[in-house]
Amino acid sequence: MAFLLHQARFYTTVNHLRDLPPTVQPEIAFAGRSNAGKSTAINVLCNQKRLAFASKTPGRTQHINYFSVGPADEPVANLVDLPGYGYAEVPGAAKAHWEMLLSSYLATRSQLCGLILMMDSRRPLTDLDRRMIEWFVPTGKPIHTLLTKCDKLTRQESINALRTAQKGLDAYRDQGVQGKLTVQLFSAMKRVGLDEAHELIESWVRPSVADEKSEPVAQ
């Protein structure tokens, strides 16, 4: 099966909101803790080995990286790799810059149509993960959580992790959050959940195509 994300390439990197590209294509943001496997997940989803880079020093990268998706001469979307968060040794000034950059981008970027939130399946819904959710939910746009590294869990542990994350997300719905909050297990190493993630992301950037696929065949 051919996936749209397999046509991905580096587009640009920015360090300030004023430098965000004036593109009109829909954007899918990827966020997560510095050790949640975000870069690895992006590379696997895009079927490339070195599209997204993880800093050798966790938390060091404070830039927003853009990857265009679709035909090179007529891209249909952008994947947006947000800076990793949660590394304790990052200086205070860098943390402040991170908070301003991410919170403002998530709250105000009109092209943004959904957030892919990476959480280590062994440590889901940390305080910083919740902060990311709370920055984004006022937009009413969907959040899809990938519980990464699920290959490191037993089957029962995976079930428990999924239930824990689902329960945490349900609490936001109980508070009246309008946007969709969904979650799945994911392993870049074992390629668990890859098709499910592909299909969901493509449904965000090409909803008309997704609707056509879901329509029953006329008899």
Curated annotation (Swiss-Prot):
<feature type="binding site">
    <location>
        <begin position="59"/>
        <end position="63"/>
    </location>
    <ligand>
        <name>GTP</name>
    </ligand>
</feature>
<keyword id="KW-0460">Magnesium</keyword>
<comment type="similarity">
    <text>Belongs to the TRAFAC class TrmE-Era-EngA-EngB-Septin-like GTPase superfamily. EngB GTPase family.</text>
</comment>
<feature type="binding site">
    <location>
        <begin position="186"/>
        <end position="188"/>
    </location>
    <ligand>
        <name>GTP</name>
    </ligand>
</feature>
<dbReference type="InterPro" id="IPR019987">
    <property type="entry name" value="GTP-bd_ribosome_bio_YsxC"/>
</dbReference>
<dbReference type="GO" id="GO:0005525">
    <property type="term" value="F:GTP binding"/>
</dbReference>
<comment type="function">
    <text>Necessary for normal cell division and for the maintenance of normal septation.</text>
</comment>
<keyword id="KW-0547">Nucleotide-binding</keyword>
<feature type="binding site">
    <location>
        <begin position="148"/>
        <end position="151"/>
    </location>
    <ligand>
        <name>GTP</name>
    </ligand>
</feature>
<feature type="binding site">
    <location>
        <position position="39"/>
    </location>
    <ligand>
        <name>Mg(2+)</name>
    </ligand>
</feature>
<feature type="binding site">
    <location>
        <position position="61"/>
    </location>
    <ligand>
        <name>Mg(2+)</name>
    </ligand>
</feature>
<dbReference type="InterPro" id="IPR006073">
    <property type="entry name" value="GTP-bd"/>
</dbReference>
<feature type="domain" description="EngB-type G">
    <location>
        <begin position="24"/>
        <end position="207"/>
    </location>
</feature>
<keyword id="KW-0131">Cell cycle</keyword>
<feature type="binding site">
    <location>
        <begin position="81"/>
        <end position="84"/>
    </location>
    <ligand>
        <name>GTP</name>
    </ligand>
</feature>
<dbReference type="InterPro" id="IPR027417">
    <property type="entry name" value="P-loop_NTPase"/>
</dbReference>
<dbReference type="InterPro" id="IPR030393">
    <property type="entry name" value="G_ENGB_dom"/>
</dbReference>
<keyword id="KW-0342">GTP-binding</keyword>
<keyword id="KW-0132">Cell division</keyword>
<dbReference type="GO" id="GO:0000917">
    <property type="term" value="P:division septum assembly"/>
</dbReference>
<feature type="binding site">
    <location>
        <begin position="32"/>
        <end position="39"/>
    </location>
    <ligand>
        <name>GTP</name>
    </ligand>
</feature>
<dbReference type="GO" id="GO:0005829">
    <property type="term" value="C:cytosol"/>
</dbReference>
<dbReference type="GO" id="GO:0046872">
    <property type="term" value="F:metal ion binding"/>
</dbReference>
<protein>
    <recommendedName>
        <fullName>Probable GTP-binding protein EngB</fullName>
    </recommendedName>
</protein>
<dbReference type="Pfam" id="PF01926">
    <property type="entry name" value="MMR_HSR1"/>
</dbReference>
<keyword id="KW-0479">Metal-binding</keyword>
<keyword id="KW-0717">Septation</keyword>
